[in-house]
């Protein structure tokens, strides 16, 4: 594992057949990360990663049948999710562009990180939060405890969006954890006025 004394900048991963980048533990800080047209998640976080990130850019490859998430974020190491530290990265100024048929985030296993001042567009929906029955150590509890935060983010051009129900339509199941997360301070469904130049991603 790499500690917070290390900063990694200007990394591009293009057209990989797996994840773009995986953070498994540690506290390394990163800036200017570009994950383009990879076939699995763009940003995969697990095993207690607690670094800081800024300017994370992702554009998802459409592989059909529901492409993978923009980010799959796990909190702890299986099978015991109660062990500290659970993952808690802090990310600012991310821009993620989906493949239209995939979710932006899958959050699970006691993950408790933060995203602020970011843009997520062209996904099917924003959040899937997994909450195992009978467990007090879940990402849902991290939302309740105030340690899983999404504040002042823009969501746009999502297939599941319904103007009548608003932000609540951007959740996978519409459960209480997902609704609480999308409803946090400053989140909005609005056109970021960004234009993507066409590319096949091949």
Regions found by a protein language model. Name each.
Residues 1-18, 22-202:
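Extracellular beta-rich repeat passengers
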């Amino acid at each position: 594992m790499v500690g917070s004394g290390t900063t990694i900048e200007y990394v591009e991963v293009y057209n990989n057949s797996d994840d773009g980048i995986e953070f498994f533990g540690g506290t390394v800080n990163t800036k200017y990360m570009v994950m383009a047209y990879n076939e699995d998640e763009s940003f995969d976080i697990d095993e207690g990663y607690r670094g800081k990130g800024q300017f994370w850019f992702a554009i998802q490859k459409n592989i059909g049948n529901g492409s993978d998430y923009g980010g799959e974020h796990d909190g702890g190491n299986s099978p015991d999710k109660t062990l500290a530290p659970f993952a808690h990265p802090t990310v600012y100024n991310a821009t993620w562009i989906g493949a239209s048929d995939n979710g932006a985030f899958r959050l699970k296993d006691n993950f408790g990180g933060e995203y602020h001042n970011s843009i997520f567009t062209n996904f099917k929906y924003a959040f899937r939060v997994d909450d195992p029955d009978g467990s007090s150590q879940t990402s849902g509890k991290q939302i309740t405890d105030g340690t899983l935060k999404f504040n002042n983010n823009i969501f746009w051009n999502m297939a599941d969006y319904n103007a009548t129900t608003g932000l609540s339509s951007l959740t996978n199941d519409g459960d209480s954890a997902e609704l609480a997360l999308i409803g946090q301070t400053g989140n909005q469904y609005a056109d970021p006025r960004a234009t993507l130049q066409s590319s096949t991603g091949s």
